[in-house]
Amino acid sequence: FNLDNVRPGHFLMRYYQLFPAKKDSLALDLLMSQLENQPRTDEGVWWHKAIYARQVWLDGIFMGLPFYTLAAPTLAPGYETDYYDDAVDQITKTDQRTYDAATRLWKHAWDETHQMFWANPTTGLSQHTWARALGWFTMAMVEILDALPESYEPRQQVIDLFQRAMTSVVEYQDATSGVWFDVLDVDDPRNYLEATASSMFAYCLLKGHRMGYLDDKFLEAGIKAYKGIIKEFVKQNANGTISLTKCCEVSGLGPENKPHLDGSFEYYMSENVRDNDPKGI
């Protein structure tokens, strides 16, 4: 029960819509079956993975819900509205559980038990806002909106949340470079401008404006971000190719046998930074 494993289903579903084939149908059914049986919190939000029991991560919303929403009319014909309702419910409950009013940002994850070593014992929240996790959360909204019919009334809830999230994202855009730091809620010289999250935010700003979800001020921020990505991260190599630099390779929270993955700022800064990470390119 690993939501990361479901993410390729979104691409496969789009391919299947163009070129239907039995072997792909079997794979799609298998992925949908996983989601239909994925363990959930008491409030009905999927666990990120079985090894992260009763935990909701922003990452997981992107890994599972876009496929779930897109595939519903094909894999559950006649019941797609139930899937849409579930998707909107999960994303709004994730908002409610991970949003931090003090920073106007969303924390990386929430532990339902409030007992994980990385979790605040009062709120269950992890310590910080990891930029890529928030990038995944905002990209999930864009992709879910692609799949929800315009006639589906609760779709507006996702638009409202997306507008609120991108307002906060723009507030944290670095004024000089136009891109974003790896940990958004920490002002520290060790923090660094990070390419994968910056690419995600640029995508959300530009597509959000193109689709009519965001007004012109967000277009300006998106163009600034795009230019910043080229200037700050894109490097021309000696052989004539280009690289996307300053990509965080990975960041996580636990499990128990990895106590150094504690969600501290120091932990996020300890993870490897490399060129051309697939999550950026």
For each predicted feature, which ranges?
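Solvent-exposed loop and edge beta-strand segments that line ligand/cofactor-binding
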Residues: 1-7, 48-61, 119-139, 150, ...
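Residue-level recognition of membrane-helix boundary sites in multi-pass small-molecule transporters
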Residues: 80-83, 218
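CBM-like carbohydrate-recognition segments
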Residues: 1-3, 22-26, 31, 44, ...
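Well-ordered alpha-helical scaffold segments within catalytic/enzyme domains
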Residues: 7-21, 65-79, 136-154, 199-214, ...
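Extracytoplasmic mature domains of secreted/periplasmic and thylakoid-lumen proteins
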Residues: 2-68
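His/Met- and acidic-residue-enriched segments that coordinate or traffic transition-metal cofactors
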Residues: 61, 65, 83, 88, ...
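Long, well-ordered core segments of solenoidal/helical folds
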Residues: 1, 26-45, 84-118, 159-177, ...
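Non-catalytic alpha-helical scaffold/packing segments enriched in small hydrophobic residues
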Residues: 136, 140-143, 157-171, 179, ...
